[in-house]
Amino acid sequence: MSFKKDDKVTFVIEDIGTGGEGIGKVDGYTLFVKDAIIGDKIEAKIIKAKKNYGYARLEKIIEASSDRVTPACPVARQCGGCQIQQMSYQAQLRFKEKLVDDNLKRIGKIEGYEFFPAIGMEEPFRYRNKAQYPVGTAKDGSIVMGFYAGRTHSIISCTDCKIGAVENQYILAVIKSWMEFNGVAPYDEQTGKGLVRHVLIRTGFHTDEIMVCLVINGTKMSDKLKESLVGRLTEVSLDSDISTDKCIKSIMLNFNTENTNVILGRQCETLWGKSYIEDYIGDIKYQISPLSFFQVNPRQTEKLYGKALEYAGLTGNETVWDLYCGIGTISLFLAKNARKVYGVEIVPQAIEDAKNNAAINGIDNAEFFVGKAEEVVPHFYEEMARLAADTSATEAQREEARKSITPDVVVVDPPRKGCDESLLDTIVKMSPERIVYVSCDSATLARDLGLLAAKGYKTVKVQPVDQFSHTVHVESVALILKEQPAID
């Protein structure tokens, strides 16, 4: 039977896609349906029909799945942030476990590993320490703040995101009132005019410090507007609506005049307070600027990094490489338990932050390099290999060079695209006993584990960690051991 656009069909959802879409079949024809979950019997309208599969819009739930819940957020269906808020949290964890395990087996052809249930959150709401709200103009001419609808740049009004900090809504209300009172226009993507593009709010969950950063379409703002903004925001930090334990410690401007989807520009100005806030992961203190990369769920990050530290098996004598180290979040965790840690990150500002974070924590056994890991590590390996063989160098220099290129442990925490194969080749050449792979995409994790398996490294344990409830994203930590050659 063939199907075409606008056909209405009734069927049961049997699976969930990687984007959170419900998947079902009608007479063998596969349909993907946003907002539907496993077990739902639905009526849907086909919006795009291809030869072997199509996409449909959920029209009516005839019989709800036992895992279906009412989303806490009233705009969950329109907003592009939470794809699976309509699933119970336990069902979300099961979905993520299955996603990781299936990818390892299907893509990586990985077998014989110990797979653990996902580490979930005690409270799967209010977990994000960072929110970036686009600012625009509604059809009636009023100022709108919120989030983009899925796959669009249409702003859905939402100032109380249920996975963000509760304080954000009150801060946004003050900024909106300030804009209205002073005639400050929102940025218009079509014309390139208007001043305020985004509002960035960062919260220190362990320190209760808040940063507010206005991203503006310009390189300056009048002193009168600055003083007015600071006056209003410093008052809101004492507002009864906000927990008295939390207050604004930093008010910043960020300048972005580019016609781009990138939210932040390169330059910032401190209007009031500090140019950063502080927070902790475990007992490591971090300074966080508007431009800093910092994990958005610090409570789950402690569990994630704790598992990485456990898998690293450090005793205090090891040499460790941390590739894609960011601002040193994992590096500094490891450094307290290792002889020496080397970190590599492509973003220069992140390396400056890493060095600063090492200094404020009194950590002197971590060294950081700027550049692409797939370029820095092979180059460093060749350079240190020459030094290790250089008879004109001191024995201490040669020994340190040997240790640096024969690490006991390598930790990788790559972006979603995973590791470059040339980097994996160099890691294998370094011959560490252990590789700890922290992944934000189980498909590329599976691919890379398959490549490592072909080079003599066996995946032993895999632990999913839910960092982002109500979304389809899941982190994983894998322990990979060097296989010992068989003894005849």
Model-derived regions: residue spans:
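Extended interfacial segments that mediate partner engagement and assembly in macromolecular machines
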Residues: 59-66, 70-71, 77-186, 206
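Rossmann-like S-adenosyl-L-methionine
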Residues: 2-7, 18, 220-227, 231-488
